[in-house]
Structures are given as structure tokens and as C-alpha cells.
UniProtKB/Swiss-Prot annotation:
InterPro entries tied to this protein: Ribosomal_eL18, Ribosomal_uL15/eL18, Ribosomal_uL15/eL18_sf
Membership in a protein family: Belongs to the eukaryotic ribosomal protein eL18 family.
Subcellular localization: Cytoplasm
Lineage: Eukaryota, Sar, Alveolata, Apicomplexa, Aconoidasida
Keywords, alphabetical: Cytoplasm, Ribonucleoprotein, Ribosomal protein
Organism field: Theileria parva
Protein name, entry field: Large ribosomal subunit protein eL18
Encoding gene, per UniProt annotation: RPL18
GO MF annotation terms: RNA binding; structural constituent of ribosome
Gene Ontology CC annotations of this record: cytosolic large ribosomal subunit
């Protein structure tokens, strides 16, 4: 008795097993974290590996303001972001932070270092805490991209239309306002 492959007999697990990017530094990090996730029985390394293998759209940026807000209650921990840490001009004072990220923008790096904090790379983090102790994993909002606004669910929200122009006549009348016949 075999399995019916047409009726989803053998469903493969989703998620990437190998890195698609050609970036040599990222490839070395994946190799390092594959080793660590195999040799240590801590889930931190497995999660970091999973996030390193993700496509770029899931490595969403995280601003300094969100980062400092999350790290308020954990001043002795290192914030680990598998993505980019960006600057936020709305913040007047940046607290002392210990940050590990794939990339930190130039202005964000200057502000973190000026406040007495430190910016680490992932290999420096492994040397410091290979099991992920005293580390807090953070991530940016993946649904905040401009492209995501165009394919929202019909039930939850109105999807943003792809319009050729933003004038009065272009997709702003019938079906968009109650004053113009009806609103969906």
C-alpha cells in the first residue's frame, strides 16, 4: 500500500534548509550557527540559524527607539537582531545598549557608541555567549513593508490599490466614499 502523492500524501516541511544568498560572510555565519545548533542544546542558536536562512524581506529593520524600548527592563542583556538596526532622529537620548546585528547604520552606530554602548558582530557574540545566555532576540515588523499594504485580506482591511496616478479621478470616487454612490 503506497501513499497518494496527488492528495498531499507526503507533505514536505516548509522553511529553508540552506542559504540562498551568495554573501560569503552570511555563509560563514550559517556554517557557524549550524555547528552551534547541533552541538549545544539551546534553542537560541537554532532560532538564530533559522532567521539567518530567511529571505531578506523577513530580516526587517528595527529602529533605535524600538530597540531601546524593548531593552529598558533588561539593561545587562545584549540585544540580538538578525537584520538591520536603524537610527531614529525622534530620540533625543540613546541609552547605553549592547547590540548585536547583521548590519547597523552609520548614524545608529555612532549614537550607540557615543552613549557608552557597544556594537557586536555575530562571531563576537558567539565568543562571548555561545549558548545565548543574557541575550534578547528581537526582530523588526515584517508586515510594515510598502508592498504588504497592497495584498491585505479583504475581510480585515481595504487593500491599497496600485494606481497610475493619485489625482481626484483615480480610484477615489465610486466604491471609495459614501458620498459617491457606495463605499465598500
Amino acid at each position: 500500500m503506497g501513499i497518494d502523492l496527488v492528495k498531499a500524501g507526503r507533505v514536505k516541511k516548509p522553511g529553508r534548509k540552506a542559504l540562498v544568498s551568495k554573501n560569503p560572510y552570511l555563509r560563514l555565519l550559517v556554517k557557524l550557527y549550524k555547528f552551534l545548533s547541533r552541538r549545544t542544546d539551546h534553542s537560541f542558536n537554532k532560532v538564530v540559524l533559522k532567521r539567518l536562512l530567511m529571505p531578506r524581506r523577513f530580516k526587517a529593520p528595527l529602529s533605535l527607539s524600538k530597540l531601546s524600548k524593548h531593552m529598558e527592563k533588561r539593561p545587562d542583556n545584549t540585544a540580538v537582531v538578525v537584520g538591520t538596526v536603524t537610527n531614529d532622529e525622534r530620540m533625543d537620548v540613546v541609552p547605553k545598549l549592547s547590540v548585536c546585528a547583521l548590519r547597523v547604520t552609520e548614524t545608529a552606530r555612532k549614537r550607540i557608541l557615543a552613549s557608552g554602548g557597544e556594537v557586536l558582530t555575530f562571531d563576537q557574540l558567539v565568543a562571548r555567549s555561545p549558548t545565548g545566555s543574557r541575550c534578547t532576540l528581537l526582530r523588526g515588523a515584517t508586515k510594515a513593508r510598502e508592498a504588504v499594504k497592497h495584498f491585505r485580506n479583504e475581510v480585515k482591511g481595504n487593500p491599497k490599490p496600485y494606481v497610475r496616478s493619485k489625482g481626484r479621478k483615480f480610484e477615489k470616487a465610486r466604491g471609495r466614499r459614501h458620498s459617491r454612490a457606495f463605499k465598500v
